[in-house]
């Protein structure tokens, strides 16, 4: 986890040009300091960091700290901070995946975004607007199977490969990956509301798990080294690793990829000045130019009307909206409610067997 404090630099103008520097200025001139969350690696920080540098050039009284990590590590710390210092959030605003944003609904973590402060929210596709605008959709990713091409001669074809005999001791994934619990249940006669089949499958095949990780780098290192051969993973990040020269491939299972939207949101506990800064940043990130550039750099799919993709993205079904047409869409809101119970079951029925 990395914190970076950005202050004004002349570089911002060179990076962004006139259009990016025309973003709104915070009205208050008293010093304002916030923390903005971004994901680490795979170009995910490029656009928000550029936007933040430009904003601070226009608003020298504002200090924006960057917290760079992942939601798995950071979100529980945000919840803990809200319990102890509700008026002083650990993170004021930033990027959150669908797992964290739905958990935040249960934990009452999010402010409603004010459309008057964030007019670009009206350009987001309706299906990616949230109840009471407690966060807003930004990009969509697909989850499929990433694998080591040196170790796997034929690309995997099904989610069930993760618990098949051919991958004993060769599977890695994030710990407590509720999507993998759900897909195992769905493929074995259950669903989100009947999870017994899924837990039974993973319990019976716990020996397939080489390691459960909590960072992108850990998962990548296991796959590249050949210690693990296969993992459920995001199509855009997989594609970036492949372009970097990693000996990896990516496959969309025959049952479909898993839809995984990402969001921008503002945390509860912000004061008026902090809310204004966060709203300005969210609004600027939602511009068609920034949404397009973020999607192009990260190979994700913008959900902002008018955003554009590269020819490379348009021609690759794993990187454009085609992947969403046949995607598995878990009931993320129900998953958020059940996550505490499911984590306990995972510990008892699956992780216990890894000791």
Over which residues does each language-model region extend?
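A bilobed periplasmic-binding-protein/Venus flytrap-type ligand-binding module shared by bacterial periplasmic
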Residues: 144-151, 185-188, 261-274, 293-294
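Conserved C-terminal helix/tail region of periplasmic/extracytoplasmic solute-binding proteins
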Residues: 325-355
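Periplasmic-binding protein-like
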Residues: 127, 140-141, 183, 200-205, ...
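A ligand-binding cleft/hinge motif common to bilobed small-molecule-binding domains
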Residues: 101-103, 224, 229-247
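Early extracytoplasmic/lumenal segment of secretory-pathway proteins
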Residues: 30-100
């Amino acid at each position: 986890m990395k914190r970076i404090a950005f202050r004004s630099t002349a570089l911002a103008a060179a990076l962004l040009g006139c259009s990016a520097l025309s973003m709104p200025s915070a009205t208050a001139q008293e010093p304002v300091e916030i923390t903005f969350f971004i994901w680490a690696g795979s170009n995910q920080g490029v656009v928000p960091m550029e936007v933040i540098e430009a904003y601070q050039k226009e608003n020298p009284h504002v200090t924006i700290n960057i917290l760079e990590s992942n939601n798995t590590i950071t979100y529980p710390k945000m919840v803990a901070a809200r319990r102890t210092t509700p008026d002083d959030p650990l993170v004021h605003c930033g990027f959150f995946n669908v797992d964290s944003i739905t958990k935040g609904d249960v934990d009452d973590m999010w402010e409603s975004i004010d459309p008057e402060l964030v007019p670009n929210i009206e350009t987001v596709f309706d299906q990616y607007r949230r109840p009471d605008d407690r966060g807003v959709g930004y990009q969509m990713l697909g989850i499929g199977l990433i694998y080591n091409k040196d170790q796997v001669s034929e690309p995997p074809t099904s989610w069930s490969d993760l618990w098949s005999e051919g991958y004993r001791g060769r599977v890695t994934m994030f710990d407590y990956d509720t999507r993998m619990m759900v897909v195992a249940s769905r493929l074995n006669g259950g669903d989100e509301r009947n999870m017994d089949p899924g837990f039974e499958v993973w319990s019976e095949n716990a020996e397939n798990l080489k390691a459960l990780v909590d960072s992108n780098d850990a998962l990548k290192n296991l796959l590249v080294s050949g210690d693990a051969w296969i993992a459920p993973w995001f199509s855009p990040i997989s594609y970036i690793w492949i372009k970097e020269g990693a000996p990896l491939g990516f496959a969309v299972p025959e049952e479909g990829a898993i839809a995984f939207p990402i969001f921008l949101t503002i945390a509860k506990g912000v004061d008026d000045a902090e809310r204004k800064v966060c709203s300005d940043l969210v609004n600027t990130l939602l511009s068609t130019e920034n949404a397009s550039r973020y999607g192009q750099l990260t190979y994700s799919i913008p959900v902002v009307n008018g955003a554009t993709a590269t020819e490379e993205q348009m021609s690759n079904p794993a990187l454009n909206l085609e992947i969403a047409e046949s995607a598995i869409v878990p009931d993320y809101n129900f998953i958020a409610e059940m996550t505490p119970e499911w984590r306990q079951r995972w510990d008892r029925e699956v992780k216990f067997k890894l000791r």
